[in-house]
């Protein structure tokens, strides 16, 4: 049984920026399930896609791994020989809790847990890279360089799975999907106070992009094949495939 998220249930006089500290880590499984529509579906599909695209003797990266849900999904599904997962998170409590979670499962796929900024991680010999609701917390001016480094570090035929909360350029549609997401959170037991305080805490640390912005960034990095494969309200996930054919001059 997961600990219930009640971080914002009482009024907070001096509300700081949201951070992935011990308090958040303690309730993270409950928080993510009650806040992100389709999260379980995305995690399951990450495992399925890793099974299809993992290449023998390659690395799989989970960048912003939190408690290791995507890492564990990949471990369960990957059967190619010689694969190795590198799971990275900047939060010390997240990495320590992920280590405890992952140690409870036996797998032939080794995992290296790294406490670091994902913008400082070298991507090498990769067949699968996962950014699961992580890029939105990276400073906007650093995002293109990160995507480029991922592309450069992928083997031909490798994939990037990019899950994000999206902003929509059509104002009425954007407003509708925001409202539907708020209804989703209300239906999952969050009060108006919790919703309001969490939104305020997140506004300076989570900055969302539109789908066309993501698509242009992926295209500019060199991904010839990319599209949205999942969406629920204003949350979704994209897949980008590095062509196995040499780029045309």
From Swiss-Prot:
Ligand binding (S-adenosyl-L-methionine): 39, 64-66, 117-118, 132, 199
Organism of this sequence: Aeromonas hydrophila subsp. hydrophila (strain ATCC 7966 / DSM 30187 / BCRC 13018 / CCUG 14551 / JCM 1027 / KCTC 2358 / NCIMB 9240 / NCTC 8049)
Protease found in the keyword field: no
Subunit structure: Homodimer.
One Gene Ontology term of the molecular function aspect: S-adenosyl-L-methionine binding
Protein name as catalogued: Carboxy-S-adenosyl-L-methionine synthase
Function field: Catalyzes the conversion of S-adenosyl-L-methionine (SAM) to carboxy-S-adenosyl-L-methionine (Cx-SAM).
Protein origin, superkingdom: Bacteria
Keyword entries, A-Z: S-adenosyl-L-methionine, Transferase
Homology family: Belongs to the class I-like SAM-binding methyltransferase superfamily. Cx-SAM synthase family.
EC number: 2.1.3.-
Database matches in NCBIfam families: carboxy-S-adenosyl-L-methionine synthase CmoA, PRK15451.1
InterPro entries per record: CmoA, Methyltransf_25, SAM-dependent_MTases_sf
Pfam families: Methyltransf_25 (PF13649)
Catalysed conversion reaction: prephenate + S-adenosyl-L-methionine = carboxy-S-adenosyl-L-methionine + 3-phenylpyruvate + H2O
Catalytic EC class: transferase
GO annotation, biological process: tRNA wobble uridine modification
SUPFAM superfamilies per UniProt: S-adenosyl-L-methionine-dependent methyltransferases
Claim: Transferase is one of the keywords in the record: yes
């Amino acid at each position: 049984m997961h600990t219930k998220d009640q971080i914002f249930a009482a009024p907070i006089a001096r509300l700081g920026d949201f951070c992935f500290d011990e308090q958040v880590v303690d309730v993270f499984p409950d928080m993510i399930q009650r806040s992100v529509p389709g999260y379980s579906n995305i995690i399951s599909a990450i495992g399925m896609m890793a099974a299809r695209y993992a290449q023998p003797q390659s690395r799989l990266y989970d960048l912003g791994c939190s408690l290791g849900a995507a890492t564990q999904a990949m471990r369960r599904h990957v059967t190619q020989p010689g694969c190795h997962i590198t799971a990275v998170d900047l939060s010390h409590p997240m990495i320590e809790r992920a280590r405890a979670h992952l140690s409870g499962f036996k797998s032939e796929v080794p995992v290296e847990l790294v406490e670091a900024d994902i913008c400082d991680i070298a991507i090498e010999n990769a067949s699968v890279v996962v950014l699961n609701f992580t890029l939105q917390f990276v400073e906007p001016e650093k995002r293109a360089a990160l995507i480029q480094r991922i592309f450069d570090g992928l083997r031909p035929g490798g994939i990037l799975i990019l899950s994000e909360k999206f902003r929509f350029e059509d104002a009425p549609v954007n407003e509708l999907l925001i409202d539907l997401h708020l209804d989703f959170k209300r239906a999952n037991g969050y009060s108006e106070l919790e919703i309001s305080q969490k939104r305020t805490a997140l506004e300076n640390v989570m900055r969302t992009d539109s789908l066309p912005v993501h698509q242009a960034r992926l295209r500019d990095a060199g991904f010839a094949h990319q599209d949205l494969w999942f969406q629920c309200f204003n949350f979704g996930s994209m897949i980008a495939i590095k062509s196995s054919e040499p780029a045309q001059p």
